[in-house]
């Protein structure tokens, strides 16, 4: 069975989409190829790396990437994680489904916000897996 492709997108591919890629690979990896990208590339936020490390997921080797049109066009599902990405998502081919899962941006906020958003993303991906 070929794996489906899920592509997580946020503004800077720095926090939310990086954490979603980490959780996605752990939770969905048997059935899905998991990628992330951004409208811009801001670099991976060190606090996002630390937040995921706290739950045993290493995203320290991830890079912050702009949206890759090839991955985008070959995805089965594109998930936008913030309103900016939702509003500025490139046009998708008709065969690519899109969903919006909005999460607060933890960048520049207290550590507890990174933990909260990390856990909310995990819950959303676990919920997605069971539907």
Swiss-Prot record:
A UniProt-annotated Pfam family: LMWPc
Entry's localization field: Cytoplasm
Gene3D superfamilies to which the protein is assigned, alphabetical: 3.40.50.2300
Active-site residues, record numbering mapped to chain: 10 (nucleophile), 82 (nucleophile), 89 (nucleophile)
Catalytic reaction annotation: arsenate + [thioredoxin]-dithiol + H(+) = arsenite + [thioredoxin]-disulfide + H2O
Family indicated by similarity: Belongs to the low molecular weight phosphotyrosine protein phosphatase family. Thioredoxin-coupled ArsC subfamily.
Protein's job: Catalyzes the reduction of arsenate [As(V)] to arsenite [As(III)].
Organism classification: Bacteria, Bacillati, Bacillota, Bacilli, Bacillales
A cellular-component GO term for this protein: cytoplasm
Molecular function GO labels: arsenate reductase (thioredoxin) activity; protein tyrosine phosphatase activity
GO biological process, one term: response to arsenic-containing substance
Keywords attached to this entry: Arsenical resistance, Cytoplasm, Disulfide bond, Oxidoreductase, Redox-active center
Xref: PANTHER family: ARSENATE REDUCTASE
InterPro entries: Arsenate_reductase_ArsC, Ptyr_pPase, Ptyr_pPase_sf
Name this protein carries in UniProt: Arsenate reductase 2
Taxonomic source organism: Staphylococcus haemolyticus (strain JCSC1435)
Cystine connections: 10-82, 82-89
EC code(s) of this entry: 1.20.4.4
Oxidoreductase keyword on record: yes
Gene: arsC2
UniProt KW Cytoplasm keyword: yes
EC class: oxidoreductase
């Amino acid at each position: 069975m070929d794996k489906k492709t899920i592509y997580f997108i946020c503004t800077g591919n720095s926090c939310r989409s990086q954490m979603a890629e980490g959780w996605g690979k752990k939770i969905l990896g048997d059935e899905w190829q998991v990628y992330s990208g951004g409208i811009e590339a801001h670099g991976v936020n060190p606090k996002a790396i630390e937040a995921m490390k706290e739950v045993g997921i290493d995203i320290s080797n991830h890079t912050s990437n702009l949206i890759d049109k090839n991955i985008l066009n070959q995805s089965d599902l594109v998930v936008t994680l913030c309103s900016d990405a939702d509003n500025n998502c490139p046009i998708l081919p008709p065969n690519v489904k899109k969903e919006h899962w909005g999460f607060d941006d933890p960048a520049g906020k207290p550590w507890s916000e990174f933990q909260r958003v990390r856990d909310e993303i995990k819950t959303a991906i676990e919920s997605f897996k069971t539907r």
